[in-house]
């Protein structure tokens, strides 16, 4: 199964509460923190909601 590396590149300060919760649900905390997540529809949907705050890389 494919995986994606998600990195928080923009701060969640002054963002809507739903965006803050989405970032936390992805497992991201501080700036430049990264997590490797499975590439499925639920993960892609969460990433889409905060795409302007994170960077995405495909991991093999």
Swiss-Prot record:
Gene3D superfamilies: Ribosomal protein L30, ferredoxin-like fold domain (3.30.1390.20). GO terms for biological process: translation. Part of the 50S ribosomal subunit. One of its GO terms (molecular function) is structural constituent of ribosome. It holds the Pfam family Ribosomal_L30. It comes from Limosilactobacillus fermentum (strain NBRC 3956 / LMG 18251) (Lactobacillus fermentum). Keywords: Ribonucleoprotein, Ribosomal protein. This is Large ribosomal subunit protein uL30.
């Amino acid at each position: 199964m494919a995986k994606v590396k998600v990195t928080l590149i923009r701060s969640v300060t002054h963002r809507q509460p739903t965006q803050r919760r989405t970032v936390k649900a992805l497992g991201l905390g501080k700036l430049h923190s990264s997590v490797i997540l499975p590439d499925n529809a639920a993960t892609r949907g969460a990433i889409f909601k905060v795409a302007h705050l994170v960077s995405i890389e495909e991991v093999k």
